[in-house]
Amino acid sequence: MSTATLRETPAAATVTTAPRGLVRTVLRLHRGALWIWLAFVAGTTGFLLWLLGPGAHTAQRALATYGYSGLIRANGSADEYSSLFYYPDTLITLASFAIALFAGGPLIARELESGTAQLAWTQSVSPARWLTAKLAVPAAFIVLGTCLLTAVYRQLWSAHGNLLIAGIGPRSLYFSLGPATVAAPLLGLALGVLVGLAVRRTLPALALSGFAYFLVYAFRGNHWPFQGRYQQPELYSRSRAFTSAGAEIRDPGCYDDKACLAKHDVVRFTREYLPSSDYWPRQLLETGVLLALTAVAVALAFALLRRRAAAG
């Protein structure tokens, strides 16, 4: 009995520690990308906190002194604050693209191209477990980082949304204030992994992963529930103008210049926006669509890996 127990103990220990060892291997192989991601999250969070504190204080003083109209004409502190407010959104979007590139190239295709993955499969690590670790480890850091950024961004919007000139603008900023911000880079990860498994060459996988995510990004920006067009009168910040005949034209930039307004026959202005009541239905549906696409990409990746492994 004692001999049997001694024989069973190492096997049990191997089963317990092998997943941890695989996680450590993924972290070690891609520690450079991990440090870049942590630096991005820390830097973007710091910038958001600056906007939440000192930046907002300066903008509020300028707004109290000059008002919206004066700040726009003078390009004052509140106008600059309104522009800076959107920078983190741009950074988050670029990060999703970068994640797709990383997943397609260094994470998957490079290891398949060099034979590192095949070597791991011969050393008691099944292809399925290898792919699970490749997906789970980056996904965990992506979820933690984007949840933090989304929480701080929402706090910033709740506290100082009044400092944005003419209110909230780009659709992408609305997107960055909710759970879809977490789902988008996960989709980038899944698409990159799928492309990497299909191509198995680093440079082509990089290019195709970026192109695949670009297609998703372009579609997301122009189809319901991802995009809606609503008209609302605005002051000083206008995206479209209407003539007395009802024709819609590009804003000529007249502001309050009556001669300019008369020259272009402009009688009113509108801009595109998403009303608050429409936010959560769209946000949750968008998140669901992105997560569904992520699940499909992951399922296809595992199916492709099984077929490749069976074919040898």
Language model segments and positions:
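Hydrophobic alpha-helical transmembrane segments of multi-pass membrane transport/permease proteins
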Residues: 32-68, 91-101, 208-219
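Aromatic-rich transmembrane-lumenal/periplasmic boundary elements in polytopic membrane proteins
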Residues: 207-255
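Secretory targeting signals
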Residues: 6-11, 42, 46-50, 86-89, ...
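Transmembrane helix boundary and interhelical loop/hinge segments in multi-pass membrane proteins
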Residues: 102-123, 135
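Alpha-helical transmembrane segments of multi-pass membrane transporters/translocases
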Residues: 2-12, 31-41, 235-238, 242-308, ...
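Alpha-helical transmembrane segments and their helix-start/interface "positive-inside/aromatic belt" motifs
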Residues: 17-44, 128-139, 200-210
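Transmembrane alpha-helical segments in integral membrane proteins
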Residues: 88-112, 187-203, 287-308
